[in-house]
């Protein structure tokens, strides 16, 4: 007899918060490992297009507002906390929608991973450095990756929903 996965009841936050917690755990452990292993700015080439490098981001994605006077730390922390509240509300309300909830759980875990950095260190720790020759994509971390994957899944879920409504 084949087992089927039951859908979490609407209002069941535990499975989705569990996913977020796993993201936070891997994100924070990876950052601790980089902090213990690398000096600031030190690079270690793993392939011809990928390095590990320890950098600090005081701004947002792509270093946006990283040179501001310091207010951005608290603004982005508040934004992350606000996003957490909205996402928890949405998860409580739509927990039965699997893909939607997984995408939100990934975004939540990533957002909280970066909020933790801002509160503990005053900046976000980035270390994944993809490059093509001398051109480097801005360094990022596992929390950023979870946010990106969650956003892509959210867009896919919405496109699927809209197409299904036709």
Curated annotation (Swiss-Prot):
The chain crosses the membrane at residues 9-29, 45-65, 71-91, 100-120, 135-155. The active site is at residues 126, 144. Signal peptide: none annotated. Belongs to the peptidase A8 family. This protein specifically catalyzes the removal of signal peptides from prolipoproteins. It is a multi-pass membrane protein. It catalyses: Release of signal peptides from bacterial membrane prolipoproteins. Hydrolyzes -Xaa-Yaa-Zaa-|-(S,diacylglyceryl)Cys-, in which Xaa is hydrophobic (preferably Leu), and Yaa (Ala or Ser) and Zaa (Gly or Ala) have small, neutral side chains. Pathway: Protein modification; lipoprotein biosynthesis (signal peptide cleavage). It is found in: Cell inner membrane. NCBIfam families: lspA. One of its GO terms (molecular function) is aspartic-type endopeptidase activity. One of its GO terms (cellular component) is plasma membrane. Its EC number is 3.4.23.36. Pfam families: Peptidase_A8. GO terms for biological process: proteolysis. This is Lipoprotein signal peptidase. It comes from Burkholderia cenocepacia (strain HI2424). It comes from the Bacteria.
């Amino acid at each position: 007899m084949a087992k089927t996965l039951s859908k979490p009841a609407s209002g069941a936050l535990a499975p989705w918060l569990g996913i977020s917690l796993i993201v936070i755990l891997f994100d924070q452990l990876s950052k601790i490992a980089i902090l213990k292993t690398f000096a600031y700015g030190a690079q270690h080439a793993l392939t011809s297009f990928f390095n590990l490098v320890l950098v600090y981001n005081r701004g947002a994605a792509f270093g946006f507002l990283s040179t501001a006077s310091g207010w951005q730390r608290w603004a982005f922390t508040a934004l992350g906390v606000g996003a957490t509240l909205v996402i928890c509300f949405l998860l409580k309300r739509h927990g039965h929608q699997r893909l939607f909830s997984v995408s939100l759980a990934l975004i939540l875990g990533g957002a909280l991973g970066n909020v933790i950095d801002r509160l503990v260190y005053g900046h976000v720790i980035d270390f994944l450095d993809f490059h093509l020759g001398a051109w480097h994509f801005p360094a990022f971390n596992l929390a950023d990756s979870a946010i990106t994957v969650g956003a892509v899944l959210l867009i896919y879920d919405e496109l699927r929903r809209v197409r299904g409504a036709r």
